[in-house]
């Protein structure tokens, strides 16, 4: 198993997929999740995922929006593997801010929002599910005009 690819996939999962991944993780996946989330948080999230699986019927819909520190941004180059540029602290400390500028409201590089960081939002997503809410994570490029992100969110809610 390629741990980086596995974790990258986890960050892109919606709440239900994340719950399923926690409950069906084999030994290697469990080790990677414990390392990424922290052992105590991993156990709490796994418990919430089990509680959510036991629930039937939703109380309603909830959309979780991340803050500036909770969304993942990934750079896509035509000849290279995608690479996370936000939030990777080491990359930021080594000049990663240079990858983030916008020009005329658009990204200078091919960067897209690719996930909501489960380390920060996983417990919230799973706790809402365990309480019976139909829970969805919405990730967006926080660098762009908030009005455009709101329009995109409104379209997604209507789907």
What are these model-predicted stretches?
Residues 1-159:
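N-terminal non-catalytic accessory region
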């Amino acid at each position: 198993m390629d741990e980086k690819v596995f974790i990258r996939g986890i960050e892109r999962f919606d709440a239900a997929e994340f719950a399923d991944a926690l409950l069906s993780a084999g030994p290697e996946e469990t080790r990677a999740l414990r390392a990424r989330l922290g052992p105590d948080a991993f156990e709490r999230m796994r418990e919430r995922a089990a509680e959510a699986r036991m629930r039937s019927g939703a109380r309603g819909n909830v959309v979780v929006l991340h803050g500036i520190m909770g969304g993942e941004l990934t750079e896509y180059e035509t000849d290279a593997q995608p690479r996370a540029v936000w939030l990777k602290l080491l990359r930021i400390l080594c000049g990663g801010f240079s990858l983030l500028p916008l020009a005329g409201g658009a990204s200078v590089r091919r960067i897209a929002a690719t996930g909501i960081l489960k380390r920060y939002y996983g417990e919230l997503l799973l706790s809402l599910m365990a309480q019976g809410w139909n829970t969805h994570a919405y990730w967006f490029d926080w660098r762009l005009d908030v009005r455009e992100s709101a329009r995109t969110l409104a379209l997604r809610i209507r789907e």
